């Protein structure tokens, strides 16, 4: 059995340490309260309880169990001494809040960090520097920047304040990069003017530089659309045609028009291969300031093309993107593997959904790629348009979708918009805190939603007043806006232009505890829907009161699913079907242990 030390390092559980600690506490006054046999019984019981959890336990959890068992033996004076000892040690630790965790990072024995993000290798110097900065930022955030009740609620797993290691800086979460504006109208990267590219391959190269710059100025993911690169296929076609005609003139050859077209298209195809490969390899080999490759999603949507010619060019880019992803990349051992990034999203639409449709071959290729590489992800144009006022657009980075928004001319706008940040509510804790009483459930729910609202407003207010100079690539040079130097970004924080999200976790366990059944059971589904509607109404109310784009965020937690489970077990013990796992179910998802086929799950 393993334990997690306070600095995040993992070590083997040692029962002798409990015996020694309790014995020392008992020997610190005249006359012992417990015999050696009683102390050993306490240690063995604590070991038994820890083993039943089926996971690594923290030092704090072990000390809580020890304290409870001392009390259970009736040794109240000893328990008081033990509590005082813990308090004194906590004061020492508070006076030196980050040293141990940073040292454990440098020595590569911080187990929390190893499990936190599979995209980061904590043994690498550049990654360590990011984690070290994160520790300092998190420490500042918890001690000086956030209200104490929000910090405590986060520590206790009542809520999760996302990305607190970036909160000290004025940074936002994720976005849709307005690549079209930057390529068509030019941009500035590191003080260097970048004008409109004169070929497809150059456009791809510039796109990767933009991606790296954007990733270094935010903590969340970003998305680009291949449709914004498609116009440069024609630019390259015209350029190649001019070059071929010049070559023909030089050697005195006059090819028939069809032969000329074949030569041009052949060279163009090579350039598309080169450009797509540039994006594929640059994205996974670039290192950003947050110690990892850019978290990028690439959107593949034929109907974003402005005309039929551009749609055909876009189809060529999509085809090559899928082919290269199907092939994969070689790792250091020379084995073909699936790269983590960029993520791919393929849109199913009328032109590619049915056999016989002009671009069905792309859907077949996408399905083939999915069967081997588990990408791309899919969006139904038809369903998304039903839900998003007739629009189809990508999620921001991983999974956060914007709400429709119109500019002053009444035109919908999606690219150039962003998410301010996320706070997640632990629905399981709401249910358990109510004791199963439905009236109390809604009362506790209101209290927790108010806590989330205040935490989200901390996120919003941290961005408020930020100058465009903080991230010129984002705010001045087109990725998100074209603001002037020294101009505040405040206007972009209101009116629904950007979103700020309430995440939720554990709907399954919440419903299971309150009703005794899964939320997929027809008799319990209504309660699950009531919970969802309640959160949605809260967001609508906050939006109305503040003119800020509050929204609901599904699937918000990753490693926090384990943190929440650990906190629930500590607060409420092991409850079969609710807290008996080392994780809780993410958002509205069906529990992994539940027997259900894929199609029923999708329908649900």
Regions found by a protein language model. Name each.
Residues 1-109:
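Charged, amphipathic alpha-helical regulatory modules used
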Residues 44-51, 296-304, 509-512, 516:
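Short, hydrophobic beta-strand segments
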Residues 18, 22, 229, 233, ...:
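Buried hydrophobic packing segments
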Residues 88-92, 98-496, 517, 521-604:
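Conserved catalytic cores of very large enzyme subunits
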Residues 23, 453, 457, 508-512:
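Amphipathic, well-packed alpha-helical segments that form the structural scaffold of globular domains
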